[in-house]
């Protein structure tokens, strides 16, 4: 690693920020180290580049050469380090908008940090998307009311108000987003769905867009799928070692059905992707039918549902079974037809994985029966049901211990030491003063043993099956409470996501 000094001049009051496009194309990052200007560069930077940076900076700087991979990581970290710039772009928008900017297409492949377009509405959208990615938001809500326009981000599963731009921006903002997502810009009376694929700071991001008419204009929700921020290993999902070992064994079975249940946004798809990634190999043919394809898995054949051309889950699943699969993943079992094909596939030598929108693991069994699946078929095919939720994890920099109240001891339903403490959120700069940073899963894994199989075959009720499994299967709330006692999350979080249980 080399370091050398250019000619010395005085340091300006504020070191200029090099444009991202220049920094990436020419391989330089201008920063400071202990008050001294420092130019970090990748190998082979041209002398002309150093002279140009010297001219722009107006001062001397040290030059330090990094390896190519190290430089790329530092480049992205440097230009994503300060989210206040993105927020300032949004707050500084004037009241006068350039209406002609709406007609200008933003190329799908353009990197938003490269954008040099001064149209305020485009700057607003660019800044909003960049800010959401930096905050690791899963959704952006743009809500129009009588007097205000509200932008909210869903961060760690909880909506947080970010900004209230000028109310007059509403129609311009919605129209531009509809243009980007290939929607009918003139149709405002019916809901529409669209999709945007773009890059932000070198990161591939898919955006699912949904609009809906409301009293004072259209509401827009953007679901962000940051392909660089997905955890595709079972050990990263927060499972206990025992559950992880059981899941690892189950997904290597030659045939049967494994179901993952939980409400929307509980991480079901991520769990399935992690399971497929673990067993993905050259000697297995793994095929999926999804709506939508959230993440690309190398070596896995993935098919997108398209109801406009009658490409449904059921039709896709039928076609997949003619493609000689070993493992089949169905994004969701929504109807009897899909359920019947999935069961038949599992009985004819295929391992099938899918999701159901039920609140409990046992609820998945009764849901399949209610759909019309015969109990004897279900008992023969079902291997296991995994119920899961996501809870926010406490910020390790500011969490603080507190005693447990008597009411909380009753809610936890387990014997605890008299001086047992739990942790509470406090809030600091590291967690944006929320007390939480990131999320983890809590799980309940029901393995279908002979006793449960017999209960399903005899059409026993949900409560009867619940009694059978509870002796040897910890509930999802118990798994959450174990994480509370370890200081990973708060009791309030676990109670929030498991109240219906």
UniProtKB/Swiss-Prot annotation:
<feature type="binding site">
    <location>
        <position position="398"/>
    </location>
    <ligand>
        <name>Zn(2+)</name>
    </ligand>
</feature>
<keyword id="KW-0547">Nucleotide-binding</keyword>
<keyword id="KW-0472">Membrane</keyword>
<dbReference type="GO" id="GO:0015628">
    <property type="term" value="P:protein secretion by the type II secretion system"/>
</dbReference>
<comment type="subunit">
    <text>Forms homooligomers; most probably hexamers. Interacts with ExeL/GspL.</text>
</comment>
<dbReference type="GO" id="GO:0015627">
    <property type="term" value="C:type II protein secretion system complex"/>
</dbReference>
<dbReference type="Pfam" id="PF00437">
    <property type="entry name" value="T2SSE"/>
</dbReference>
<dbReference type="GO" id="GO:0016887">
    <property type="term" value="F:ATP hydrolysis activity"/>
</dbReference>
<dbReference type="InterPro" id="IPR013369">
    <property type="entry name" value="T2SS_GspE"/>
</dbReference>
<keyword id="KW-0653">Protein transport</keyword>
<dbReference type="Pfam" id="PF22341">
    <property type="entry name" value="GSPE_N1E"/>
</dbReference>
<comment type="similarity">
    <text>Belongs to the GSP E family.</text>
</comment>
<feature type="binding site">
    <location>
        <position position="395"/>
    </location>
    <ligand>
        <name>Zn(2+)</name>
    </ligand>
</feature>
<keyword id="KW-0479">Metal-binding</keyword>
<protein>
    <recommendedName>
        <fullName>Type II secretion system protein E</fullName>
        <ecNumber>7.4.2.8</ecNumber>
    </recommendedName>
</protein>
<dbReference type="InterPro" id="IPR027417">
    <property type="entry name" value="P-loop_NTPase"/>
</dbReference>
<keyword id="KW-0997">Cell inner membrane</keyword>
<keyword id="KW-0813">Transport</keyword>
<keyword id="KW-1003">Cell membrane</keyword>
<dbReference type="InterPro" id="IPR037257">
    <property type="entry name" value="T2SS_E_N_sf"/>
</dbReference>
<feature type="binding site">
    <location>
        <position position="428"/>
    </location>
    <ligand>
        <name>Zn(2+)</name>
    </ligand>
</feature>
<keyword id="KW-0067">ATP-binding</keyword>
<keyword id="KW-0862">Zinc</keyword>
<feature type="binding site">
    <location>
        <begin position="262"/>
        <end position="269"/>
    </location>
    <ligand>
        <name>ATP</name>
    </ligand>
</feature>
<dbReference type="GO" id="GO:0005524">
    <property type="term" value="F:ATP binding"/>
</dbReference>
<feature type="binding site">
    <location>
        <position position="431"/>
    </location>
    <ligand>
        <name>Zn(2+)</name>
    </ligand>
</feature>
<dbReference type="GO" id="GO:0005886">
    <property type="term" value="C:plasma membrane"/>
</dbReference>
<comment type="function">
    <text>ATPase component of the type II secretion system required for the energy-dependent secretion of extracellular factors such as proteases and toxins from the periplasm. Acts as a molecular motor to provide the energy that is required for assembly of the pseudopilus and the extrusion of substrates generated in the cytoplasm.</text>
</comment>
<dbReference type="InterPro" id="IPR003593">
    <property type="entry name" value="AAA+_ATPase"/>
</dbReference>
<dbReference type="InterPro" id="IPR054757">
    <property type="entry name" value="GSPE_N1E"/>
</dbReference>
<dbReference type="InterPro" id="IPR001482">
    <property type="entry name" value="T2SS/T4SS_dom"/>
</dbReference>
<dbReference type="GO" id="GO:0008564">
    <property type="term" value="F:protein-exporting ATPase activity"/>
</dbReference>
<dbReference type="GO" id="GO:0046872">
    <property type="term" value="F:metal ion binding"/>
</dbReference>
<keyword id="KW-1278">Translocase</keyword>
């Amino acid at each position: 690693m080399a370091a050398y000094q250019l000619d010395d001049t005085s340091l300006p009051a504020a070191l200029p920020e090099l444009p991202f496009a220049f920094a990436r194309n020419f391989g330089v990052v201008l920063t400071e180290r202990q008050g001294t200007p420092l130019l970090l560069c990748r190998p082979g930077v041209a002398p002309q580049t150093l002279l140009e940076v010297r001219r722009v900076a107006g001062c001397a700087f040290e030059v330090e050469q990094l390896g190519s991979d190290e430089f790329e990581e530092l480049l992205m970290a440097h230009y994503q380090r300060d989210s206040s710039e993105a927020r300032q772009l949004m707050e500084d928008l004037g009241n006068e908008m350039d209406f002609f900017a709406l007609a200008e297409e933003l190329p799908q492949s353009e990197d938003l940090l490269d954008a040099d377009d001064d149209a305020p509405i485009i700057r607003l959208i660019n800044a909003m998307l960049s800010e959401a990615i930096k905050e690791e938001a899963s959704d952006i809500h743009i809500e129009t009311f009588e007097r205000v326009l509200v932008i909210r981000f869903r961060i760690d599963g909880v909506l947080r108000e970010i900004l209230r731009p000028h109310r007059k921006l509403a129609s311009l903002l919605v129209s531009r987003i509809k243009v980007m997502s290939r929607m009918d810009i003139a149709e405002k009376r019916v809901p529409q769905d669209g999709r945007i694929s773009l890059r932000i700071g070198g990161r591939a991001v898919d955006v699912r867009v949904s609009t809906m008419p409301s009293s004072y204009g259209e509401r827009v929700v953007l679901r962000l799928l940051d392909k660089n921020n997905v955890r595709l290993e079972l050990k990263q999902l927060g499972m206990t070692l025992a559950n992880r070992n059981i899941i690892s064994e189950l997904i290597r079975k030659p045939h049967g059905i494994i179901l993952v249940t939980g409400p929307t946004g509980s991480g079901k798809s991520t769990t399935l992707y992690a399971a497929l990634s673990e067993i993905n190999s050259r000697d297995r043919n793994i095929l999926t039918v999804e709506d939508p394809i959230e993440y690309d898995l190398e070596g896995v054949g993935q098919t997108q549902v398209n109801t406009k051309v009658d490409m449904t889950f059921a039709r896709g699943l039928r076609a997949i079974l003619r493609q000689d699969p070993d493992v089949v993943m169905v994004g969701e079992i929504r109807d009897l037809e899909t359920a019947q094909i999935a069961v038949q596939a599992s009985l004819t030598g295929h391992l099938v994985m899918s999701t159901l929108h039920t609140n409990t693991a046992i609820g998945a069994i009764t849901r399949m029966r209610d759909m019309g699946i015969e109990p004897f078929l279900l008992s023969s095919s079902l291997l296991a049901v995994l119920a899961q939720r996501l809870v926010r994890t406490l910020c390790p920099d500011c969490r603080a211990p507190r005693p447990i109240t008597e009411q909380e001891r009753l809610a936890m339903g387990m014997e605890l030491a008299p001086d047992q403490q739990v942790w509470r959120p406090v809030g600091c700069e590291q967690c944006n003063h929320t007390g939480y940073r990131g999320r983890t899963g809590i799980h309940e894994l029901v393995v279908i043993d002979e006793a449960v199989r017999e209960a399903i075959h005899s059409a026993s009720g949900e409560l009867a099956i619940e009694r059978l499994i509870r002796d040897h299967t910890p509930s999802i709330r118990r798994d959450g409470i174990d994480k509370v006692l370890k200081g990973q999350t708060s009791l309030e979080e676990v109670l929030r996501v498991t109240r219906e249980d």
